[in-house]
Structure formats: structure tokens, C-alpha cells
Amino acid sequence: MMISDLPEDMVEEILSRVSIISLGALRWNDLSKARVICKAEARQQFAGFMIKGSKVCSMRFDLHGIQNNNVEVVEPSIKQIAKFNHVEISQVFHCDGLLLMMSKEVSNTRLVVWNPYLGKIWSIQHRSAYHSENRYTLGYDNNRKPQNLEVAYHSIKGITYLFNGGEKIGEGPTGCLLCFDFTRERFGPSLPLPFHVAHLYTEQLAVLLHNWGAFAMEIWVTTNIEPNAVLMEQLLKNYLLYTSDFIGSFFIDQEKKHAVIFDSSLSCGSVACIIGETGNLRTVDLGVAAVPYRQLPVCSYAPSLEQINQGQELPLIGLTQIFMEQHKYWVSTFLDNLITKYG
């Protein structure tokens, strides 16, 4: 019997018990797209990274103790990554086990790709200057070659999605998703959404609606998402027991219908709000000073064997959002090249 003949859950349990050194020569693309997945462990805890005081920190939440009637949850474990102590980071983004980070220095802004599981770091050299307000993300073309895209926010299955609110800010369509095809280097059709805020959770897209007037929050998840179609169902609806200045990233436990929302509030600081169908379960102080009108940079993480070849040129599709009179905006694009460098 071949290992490929075993049930997927059993294979994942085996892989979770094998060291990365032993797995280094193997490719499990058909099974897990080169990701080392531990679903049983993932259901019990959230692993991710965040920016705390301009430093990269690992973060882990234990979800096992969250109960509706007896609220017990282990405090999050937040640890600063020592190898980046000398760098101030402003952005962090995850795609298939790779972290894309942007340094905070105005005069010497850099992009770095890091695989925490393999411990490898690649710096990205740009032929032109970076802009501090630009946003960057990772995706893949048909050959699974890493690509870069500016201003997009979410990646799923190696495809990047960005949220578009309409022709005028606060007016026009209620919102849609735009999919960027890294193979053709162009956008696909608009995917309609009923809400204004969208975030990513692992292999599904989760959409969050914050109804300020009704103090209500809804979370919907995709049942099917492709570059040209999206189907969603409601996961939970919660009537908020707190007010928020700016809601940022979040992750969900679909089985228990819980959500952990990272909230940046000038009155409460940066917190993780744990909510369920019955209401607010707990609020955890993350010990990070809140920045007005800024999301707390947090991303989930799943380990991977993905690597980037040294000296590989990556096409950079730049999107620069320009605000004009009457709150209209346009998006201009440009094409440049990135050259990766190991070390």
C-alpha cells in the first residue's frame, strides 16, 4: 500500500509527527499543495504573526477552553522573532506558508519574504522606490511561481483578491471582489458581495459585516470560490456588546461558530474579541498601542515547504489608488520587475 492510498486525515496525522528534515525531499502537491497541514491541531488553536511595536511577533491562541457557559481561554502566546530585531516592520502578509513583510524605514523601505517553517529569508530588490502607503501581497501563476501584487489584501489558493467598494467612496455598488490572475497578469470579472468588509481565513474567504446602526455583526463564509464565481452562507450573527473604532483581521472556528476579531480601539487599545452566537465570550488585551484608523497587522499561518529561487525575476503589477475631487478615485497600473535574493 502506498501512502497516497491512505485517508487524507491519516496522512496529515503522519506528516504532523515527522520532522521537516525528513520531509524536505518530498512534495505533496496533489494532497496538500506542498503545505504541511495538521487539521486536528488547527481546530484547537490559531497560529499566526502580528506586528507589535514595529517588530514581527509570533502569536498562538488556544481555542480548546472556550465554552459558552464556562468561559476559559488560555492567554495568547506572543513572542518577538529575534532574527528581525534590527528591522522595523509595517506590514505582514501570508500566502501558502510564505510571509511577505515590508520594512518601516522611509528612506530604505524593503520587502522581505520569509518561510518560518524552513527558516529561509529572501530579500526583494525593487528597481524603483517603494511608497509607504502601498500594500503588497503574494500569489502564484499556473506554474506555482511566486508573484507580487501591490494594494491587494487577501490570497486564497495562490490567487489574490482585493475588495472594491464602488466608483465613489460610500456610494455605488455595495461592494465586490476583484480576482487578479498572476498567469495572465490581469483582473478577472467582479464578484458581487453583500457586504463592505472582507478578510481571509485559510482555504475559505470569510466576509464580515459590521452594521453600526444595529450594533450587529455577521460573518459569512464561502462554500465555493473561483476566479469567476463565489457562493456564501452565513456562519453567525452577533449583537455587539461593545463599540469599536476600527475592526481589523479576524479568524473563525466554523465547528463551534466562534470568531476572534482583532480590534484597535483608542479607548481599549488593541484587543482580541472572542464572540459566538450567544454574545461576547471574552476580550483579551494584546498589549499593543492602538493607532487611529489603522488595522492591527495580524495574519494567520500554516507551515509550508514553498521556496523562491535565488535571482528569480518577479513581475510587479503596481496599483496606485489616486483620490480626486468629489471623492472619485481611479486606479493606475504599472509593470516592473523584482529580483529575489537569498539572505
Curated annotation (Swiss-Prot):
Domain F-box: residue ranges: 1-46
Superkingdom per UniProt: Eukaryota
Pfam families: FBA_1
Cross-referenced InterPro entries: F-box-assoc_dom_typ1, F-box-like_dom_sf
Name used for this protein in its record: Probable F-box protein At1g67455
The organism of origin for this protein: Arabidopsis thaliana (Mouse-ear cress)
